[in-house]
Amino acid sequence: MSIILIGFMGAGKSTVAKLLAEEFTDLDKLIEEEIEMPIATFFELFGEADFRKIENEVFELAVQKDIIIATGGGIIENPKNLNVLDRASRVVFLTADFDTLWKRISMDWQNVRPLAQDKEAAQLLFEKRMKDYSLVADLTIDVTDKSPEQIAELIREKWEIE
C-alpha cells in the first residue's frame, strides 16, 4: 500500500520520501518524464489547467503501486485527485506556517516554482489549499521544528515501516 506525502511547497515532501524509501516516486519527476520538459516550461506554454489534467493521469497510475509518493503541492487542485487521495489509506500531510514555508521556498534555487513567484499570491494559495490537505490526511505532521529524519521516523512509527 502506498504512502502519499502531501503539503504546500517547501514542506519537505521529496526530502522525507527519500528518507522513507530508496525507491520512492516524486510525482513531479514522473510528470516531467511524461511531458518531456520541465514543469515550469509546460506551465508557461500550456497553463495550469493542462498541467493538472496530466498530473491527475500520472497520479492515478502511480497510486496503484506499493510505493512512497511525494506529490506536488497542487495535487489537491483537481477534484479527481482529491477522490484518489480520499480512497488512499496512508496520506501524510506535512504542514508548517506560511512564513516558514516561504522562507524555504525563497532559499530553494534548484526548483523553479511557477506558482511561487509572488509572496502575496503564494500566501493566498496556501490559505486556499490548507483545508483540502487536512480533509484527506490520515496523519498530519507539523514540520516547523522537525528535521526530515524526525519526520520520517514519525511516519515509520505510525505504520510500522522498517
From Swiss-Prot:
ATP binds at residues 10-15, 113. Keywords: Amino-acid biosynthesis, Aromatic amino acid biosynthesis, ATP-binding, Cytoplasm, Kinase, Magnesium, Metal-binding, Nucleotide-binding, Transferase. One of its GO terms (cellular component) is cytosol. Substrate binds at residues 28, 52, 73, 129. It is found in: Cytoplasm. Its cofactor is Mg(2+). Mg(2+) binds at residue 14. It comes from the Bacteria. It catalyses: shikimate + ATP = 3-phosphoshikimate + ADP + H(+). Its EC number is 2.7.1.71. Pathway: Metabolic intermediate biosynthesis; chorismate biosynthesis; chorismate from D-erythrose 4-phosphate and phosphoenolpyruvate: step 5/7. It holds the Pfam family SKI. SUPFAM superfamilies: P-loop containing nucleoside triphosphate hydrolases. Its main location: cytoplasm. It is an enzyme of class 2 (transferase). GO terms for molecular function: ATP binding; magnesium ion binding; shikimate kinase activity. GO terms for biological process: amino acid biosynthetic process; aromatic amino acid family biosynthetic process; chorismate biosynthetic process. PROSITE patterns: SHIKIMATE_KINASE. Binds 1 Mg(2+) ion per subunit. Belongs to the shikimate kinase family. PANTHER family: SHIKIMATE KINASE, SHIKIMATE KINASE 1, CHLOROPLASTIC. Catalyzes the specific phosphorylation of the 3-hydroxyl group of shikimic acid using ATP as a cosubstrate. Monomer. This is Shikimate kinase. It comes from Lactococcus lactis subsp. cremoris (strain SK11). The lineage of its organism: Bacteria, Bacillati, Bacillota, Bacilli, Lactobacillales.
